[in-house]
A protein has these predicted regions:
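Conserved acetyl-CoA binding element of GNAT-fold acetyltransferases
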Residues: 71-83
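Conserved acetyl-CoA-binding loop of GNAT-fold acetyltransferases
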Residues: 120-135
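Conserved beta-strand in the GNAT
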Residues: 53, 59-67, 74
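Conserved beta-strand-loop-alpha-helix junction that forms the acyl-donor binding cleft
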Residues: 108-124
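A short helix-loop-beta-strand connector motif used in the catalytic cores of GNAT acetyltransferases and
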Residues: 41-53, 74
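A short beta-loop-alpha structural element at the N-terminal edge
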Residues: 1-18
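Conserved GNAT-fold acetyl-CoA-binding loop/helix
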Residues: 21-40
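Conserved acetyl-CoA-binding loop-helix of GNAT-fold acetyltransferases
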Residues: 86-100
Length: 142
């Protein structure tokens, strides 16, 4: 059963890092697992940032991690396992959370994992079109 949007816990870091490192490897990029783990842990420990997951029967299938800063907001990671990208119960909570947090604000991005259309369609030159994303969310909620 697919869970609601939940905060990522410190014990989830290894699993999330495995997703990131595996995807990098499949794209021919070599990563340092320690560096990836340290970066994710830093983002998650700072509760001013946001780190959320969705699980299916206790297994993480999607996550978002974003940084809130005084001068800039950044979507650090947006990942949805491929077979869950058409699930409304996964996509609506993830995209709604971004709209809720960043409506009327600028949202940059670092890495959009595996071209998740719901986000990449609204991404251009390092910035997410939050208004366009909100229209998308409203459309798929119906």
């Amino acid at each position: 059963m697919i869970s609601e949007l939940k905060e990522i816990e410190l014990e989830d870091i290894a699993i999330i890092c495995n997703y990131i490192n595996e995807e990098a490897r499949s794209n021919g990029v070599i990563t340092d697992p320690f560096v990836v783990s340290s970066n994710i842990e830093f983002l998650i420990r700072d509760r001013y940032n946001g780190a959320y997951k969705i699980e299916d029967d206790g297994v993480i299938v999607a996550f978002i991690i974003y940084e809130r800063q005084y001068h800039e907001n950044t979507l650090a990671h947006f990942y949805v396992e491929p077979r869950y990208r058409t699930y409304r119960s996964v996509m609506i909570p993830l995209t709604s959370k971004l709209v809720e947090e960043f409506k009327g604000k600028r949202l940059n991005y670092k890495k959009l994992h595996s071209k998740v259309d719901a986000i990449t369609h609204y991404a251009n030159n390092g910035e997410i079109d939050v208004e366009g994303l909100e229209e998308f969310v409203n459309r798929i909620k119906r």
